[in-house]
From Swiss-Prot:
It comes from the Eukaryota. GO terms for molecular function: DNA binding; DNA-binding transcription factor activity. This is Ethylene-responsive transcription factor 1. Probable transcriptional activator that may be involved in defense signaling pathway. Binds in vitro to the DNA sequence 5'-AGCCGCC-3' of the GCC-box element found in pathogenesis-related (PR) gene promoters. The transcriptional activation is enhanced in vitro by the presence of MPK12/BWMK1. InterPro entries: AP2/ERF_dom (IPR001471), AP2/ERF_dom_sf (IPR036955), DNA-bd_dom_sf (IPR016177), ERF_plant (IPR044808). The keyword Transferase does not apply. Phosphorylated in vitro by MPK12/BWMK1. Keywords: Activator, DNA-binding, Nucleus, Phosphoprotein, Plant defense, Transcription, Transcription regulation. GO terms for cellular component: nucleus. Interacts with MPK12/BWMK1. GO terms for biological process: defense response; ethylene-activated signaling pathway. Belongs to the ethylene-response factor family. Class 1 subfamily.
Length: 365
């Protein structure tokens, strides 16, 4: 009694009643709504008309955006100017939508409307009028700055040179004919610049030892016989006889006798006394014998007078009487015995030493 009024509506339905479905809960037709990913979600399992489905599908194609012809790889320097197409829908008698385009003439018209911002590839103009060139290096993954140029052509040629260096023959350049002309110019420059070897032959200087008797003999350079310039003898120089050109110039021969290298020594010597071996220099006979007739001096009295040779060689036997020493038991010995060291080395034994017995005795003590 107390609770019957509250729960009377909770009584179960008879078994013959049907189950609730979506059609019973939402009897009106639901329009499809857009979801993520461009898919359509339908609220209920309602059969749709074929004509409405075709119209909705065509509307989806129109609103999907640009066609696949517009998509592609674009350069940084290319600017695409495309006018948006104006679409108009017209309904036919059978309620099918037909699309008519205004201002769309196909892909050929679009490609004609594509316009490059710069005439050359890889360059751009600065606000102050200069032209900058740069290129992307695929190996480094960065843009390489090529510099700023006064004209667009100079910048384009700099881009072409760097592109050929990086990509080789596959590079896209602004001036394809530039490499052939550059090679021709390089070939012409190499042929024009031929090596010119101009070696000046300088006369060699050789000393003439044909007048060894004169210590102040002048040493003159031997003239090169291939040159046509005559040899000019300077003033204030001692006379040097002319040599025969056919005779070879030989160096002086220096002879040193082994016997003359022996040094004389005694028990009582001085530190400041220096003794050197005798070294004689002898000129070759060929240079002295082959003297031209021009070596003789012409005088007024005699037609040919031989030149006066100073410091002529003197034989030692001629000076032997003047070189005798006042020695006891050796006054008559030859100088040859002294030079050959035939004398005894014991100088002390040959000397007579005095003693106190030899002194006279005085009578003062």
């Amino acid at each position: 009694m107390c609770g019957g009024a509250i729960i009377h509506h909770l009584k179960g339905h008879p078994e013959g009643s049907r189950r609730a479905t979506e059609g019973l809960l939402w009897p009106e037709k639901k329009k499809p709504r857009w979801g993520g990913g461009g898919r359509r979600h339908f609220g209920g399992f309602v059969e749709e008309d074929d004509e409405d489905f075709e119209a909705d599908f065509e509307e989806f194609e129109v609103d999907s955006g640009d066609s696949d012809l517009e998509l592609g790889e674009e350069d940084d320097d290319d600017v695409v100017e495309i006018k948006p197409a104006a679409f108009k829908r017209a309904l036919s008698r059978d309620n099918l939508s037909t699309i008519t385009t205004a201002g769309f003439d196909g892909p050929a018209a679009k490609s004609a409307k594509r316009k490059r911002k710069n005439q050359f590839r890889g360059i751009r103009q600065r606000p102050w009028g200069k032209w900058a060139a740069e290129i992307r290096d695929p190996r480094k993954g960065v843009r390489v700055w090529l510099g700023t140029f006064n004209s667009a052509e100079e910048a384009a040629r700099a881009y072409d040179a760097e592109a050929r260096r990086i990509r080789g023959k596959k590079a896209k350049v602004n001036f394809p004919e530039a490499p052939t002309t550059a090679q021709k110019r390089r070939a012409g420059s190499t042929t024009a610049k031929a090596p010119k070897s101009s070696v000046e032959q300088k006369p060699t200087v050789k000393p003439a030892f044909n007048n060894l008797a004169n210590a102040n003999a002048f040493v003159y350079p031997s003239a090169n016989f291939t040159s046509n310039k005559p040899f000019v003898q300077p003033d204030n120089m001692p006379f040097v006889p002319a040599m025969n050109s056919a005779a070879p110039i030989e160096d002086p021969i220096i002879n040193s006798d082994q016997g003359s290298n022996s040094f004389g020594c005694s028990d009582f010597g001085w530190e400041n006394d220096t003794k050197t071996p005798d070294i004689t220099s002898i000129a070759p006979i060929s240079t002295i014998a082959e003297v031209d007739e021009s070596a003789f001096i012409k005088s007024s009295t005699n037609p040919m007078v031989p030149p006066v040779m100073e410091n002529s060689a003197v034989d030692l036997p001629d000076l032997e009487p003047y070189m005798r020493f006042l020695l006891d038991d050796g006054a008559g010995d030859s100088i040859d015995s002294l030079l050959n060291l035939d004398g005894s080395q014991d100088v002390v034994s040959n000397m007579d030493l005095w003693s106190f017995d030899d002194m006279p005795v005085s009578d003062f003590y």
